[in-house]
Amino acid sequence: MDTKHFLPLDFSTQVNSSSLSSPTGRGSMAAPSLHPSLGPGLGSPLGSPGQLHSPISTLSSPINGMGPPFSVISSPMGPHSMSVPTTPTLGFETGSPQLNSPMNPVSSSEDIKPPLGLNGVLKVPAHPSGNMSSFTKHICAICGDRSSGKHYGVYSCEGCKGFFKRTVRKDLTYTCRDNKDCLIDKRQRNRCQYCRYQKCLAMGMKREAVQEERQRGKDRNENEVESTSSANEDMPVEKILEAELAVEPKTETYVEANMGLNPSSPNDPVTNICQAADKQLFTLVEWAKRIPHFSELPLDDQVILLRAGWNELLIASFSHRSIAVKDGILLATGLHVHRNSAHSAGVGAIFDRVLTELVSKMRDMQMDKTELGCLRAIVLFNPDSKGLSNPAEVEALREKVYASLEAYCKHKYPEQPGRFAKLLLRLPALRSIGLKCLEHLFFFKLIGDTPIDTFLMEMLEAPHQTT
């Protein structure tokens, strides 16, 4: 016969035997006398060596430290001595006389505890049984309403719990209009705040428990602030913003140098975009070197990351720069490319995607330069780039940018809890648009009718570095 099914029974009897058996190994207390529902199966001596061969008996289980088995066999609702204490010195009426009073008709849900005068008839013991202990846990010790658990040391309802917490936290003072002996029950608990608070104290509610709860909340908030600040120290958003601002003057220089040019340049939009991209690739390298920890990576890895992300990095930049432009984009050279020109040049579909999925979304949420810089840093630290010597290191840097950006959003825009997620949702669109733009550039390079300068040509001739 397979004995595995009997392991739980053997284990429980073994645990009970250690508590119930006498030094001679014979059971000094029969299990049926403890609880009739357990049946006669546990009435035999429990010290027989045949029951000690189960492998589970050698394990250190928490149940071995439970002591006598009474807590296991009796009601799980707690110790037998649990009852609602009385405080006659304060003039509060206890449960039973209150139930007997003709002025307080009871509902069916409250008519559970028998009047004290019926103890002899119903054979209610002097000390409450396990069932009575269970009952006291289901009622509020202050007003007799249904208890929601133990609060500040006493089983109480949500109403009395909240009342006591507010009183302690706000350090409120009450006055009784009568003789400081008002009846506090479910129906009248709100009539006298003074007597209700005094009864909370009399029943055992602890002021210090409320204060400790508040301190725990403060400590938790301080820990969160410390964790966010430590993340920001590893990848400070201030440095990321500095990197964005450092390349901005060069963009403005391009704009000033081209102020005399007619915005509708004789060159087609694709040529203008390619020329702007070639110039921006130089500033992109300078930007990347200013991003924290990028220059600490092996030089080969730096090159791989820039080759893998240059197109998305440039698209993110000119999209954010174009927030103030209507139906067009502003290039770093200072030229505007209108959507009509893009459609005429045959790149209208991808141009419209840039406007709707990037420029418009950035405008709607008023994305600032710090957030733009963090998104670009996330693109830069791409652990999926092929050929990296240590992808895990790059992934760790990306995670630090995530943490710093999230902390920045919570601090700068506390009224927008979903802002961090909205920012990250721009990344898939940026990736998709970047790949489509690469397809167009490869096509223009292939047919050869669009002048592509040296740096951009080098980027296009290198194999695409992402998986």
From Swiss-Prot:
One GO term of the cellular component aspect?
chromatin
Query: What GO annotations for molecular function exist for this entry?
Result: chromatin DNA binding; DNA binding; DNA binding domain binding; DNA-binding transcription factor activity; double-stranded DNA binding; enzyme binding; identical protein binding; LBD domain binding
Question: Does the keyword section mention Transcription regulation?
Answer: yes
Q: Where is this region: Disordered?
A: 1-61, 79-109, 211-233
Q: In which tissues is it expressed?
A: Expressed in the adrenal gland with main expression in the zona fasciculata and medulla (at protein level). Expressed in aortic endothelial cells, with high expression in the descending thoracic aorta and the outer curvature of the aortic arch, where pulsatory shear stress exists, but very low in the inner curvature of the aortic arch, where oscillatory shear stress prevails (at protein level).
User: What main location does UniProt list?
Assistant: nucleus
Keywords, A to Z, come to:
Acetylation, Cytoplasm, DNA-binding, Isopeptide bond, Metal-binding, Mitochondrion, Nucleus, Phosphoprotein, Receptor, Transcription, Transcription regulation, Ubl conjugation, Zinc, Zinc-finger
Hinge as annotated region, ranges: 206-229
Binding sites annotated in the UniProt record for 9-cis-retinoate: R321, A332
Q: Which residues bind Zn(2+) 1?
A: C140, C143, C157, C160
Name the PROSITE patterns on file: NR_LBD (PS51843), NUCLEAR_REC_DBD_1 (PS00031), NUCLEAR_REC_DBD_2 (PS51030)
Phosphothreonine: which positions carry it? T87
Q: Which GO terms describe its biological process?
A: axon regeneration; camera-type eye development; cardiac muscle cell proliferation; cell differentiation; cellular response to insulin stimulus; embryo implantation; female pregnancy; gene expression
Q: Where is this cross-link: Glycyl lysine isopeptide (Lys-Gly) (interchain with G-Cter in SUMO2)?
A: K4
Write down which residues bear the modification named N6-acetyllysine. K150
Location of region: Nuclear localization signal: 165-170
Amino-acid positions noted as binding Zn(2+) 2 in the UniProt annotation, renumbered to this chain:
C176, C182, C192, C195
**Per the record, where are the segments of Low complexity compositional bias?**
32-55
Please quote what the entry notes about the protein's domains: Composed of three domains: a modulating N-terminal or AF1 domain, a DNA-binding domain and a C-terminal ligand-binding or AF2 domain.
Functional description taken from the UniProt entry: Receptor for retinoic acid that acts as a transcription factor. Forms homo- or heterodimers with retinoic acid receptors (RARs) and binds to target response elements in response to their ligands, all-trans or 9-cis retinoic acid, to regulate gene expression in various biological processes. The RAR/RXR heterodimers bind to the retinoic acid response elements (RARE) composed of tandem 5'-AGGTCA-3' sites known as DR1-DR5 to regulate transcription. The high affinity ligand for retinoid X receptors (RXRs) is 9-cis retinoic acid.
Q: What is this protein called?
A: Retinoic acid receptor RXR-alpha
Gene coding for it: Rxra
